Each structure stands twice: as structure tokens, then as C-alpha cells.
């Protein structure tokens, strides 16, 4: 049985209020899937207010014009586990170093990793704009 957590419910109420009152003014501008508010609700429901708050803040900080966006499930959820199983190249352990493109490790030169480099344009791509080209007009 789940216990009543008043701070968590207060935070959930805040996010739902944001979605109802503020979010419609901006339209669909989130670069991530699920949207930042959906991510926040899911994090609060799964982890509670104390563990979810840093996750939500970090997610909001990442949602900026210089970010590529993409699928970003809440850590510790079945969706995140399934994503890691289907896409092991996106998971990083705490001890794994950041990829150094100056060494000759062939794993660093895989197409999926090259595309994650800011400013990288695939030679076969017709896109010449900024990474936020899929956001639409602001």
C-alpha cells in the first residue's frame, strides 16, 4: 500500500497546474519525449519529491536551444529499462569514460556516436540548420 506523501502530491499539483495554465501559452515546444511536464509527473509518481526534484531540474536545464532532444525516459522506470535493453549504446556506467575522439578506439567512430556530437552533420543529410530544426516556430 502506498502511503500518503503530501509534498509529492503538492508537487504533482504544481506540475498539473503548469500544464493546464502555462503550458498552453507556449504550445508544443519540448524537444524531448516524453515532454518535460510528463517527465516531471512520472518522476514524482515513481521517486517522490526528494529524489525527483533533481531529475526534473536537470531535465529542464537540458531542454534548451543547444540540445538535440530525443527520447529521455525517467530513470528507474520500466520504460528506461526497456530503452536500455533495446539501445545499449545509450547507457553509460558511472565508471565509463567520456568518448575521446582522438584515440583509435573504433567504438568511438560508430555512426550513432558521431551523430551525437554537437554540430556534426551527416554527409548524406540535407539538413543544414541548427539541431532545433524539428521544434517548429517559437
From Swiss-Prot:
Q: Where is this region: Disordered?
A: 71-138
Q: Where in the cell is it found?
A: Cell membrane
Give the top-rank taxon of the lineage listed in the UniProt record for this protein: Bacteria
Q: Where in this chain does the entry annotate a coiled-coil region?
A: none
Q: Which family does it belong to?
A: Belongs to the UPF0161 family.
Functional description taken from the UniProt entry: Could be involved in insertion of integral membrane proteins into the membrane.
Please report the name of this protein according to its UniProt entry: Putative membrane protein insertion efficiency factor
Which taxonomic lineage is given here? Bacteria, Bacillati, Actinomycetota, Actinomycetes, Propionibacteriales
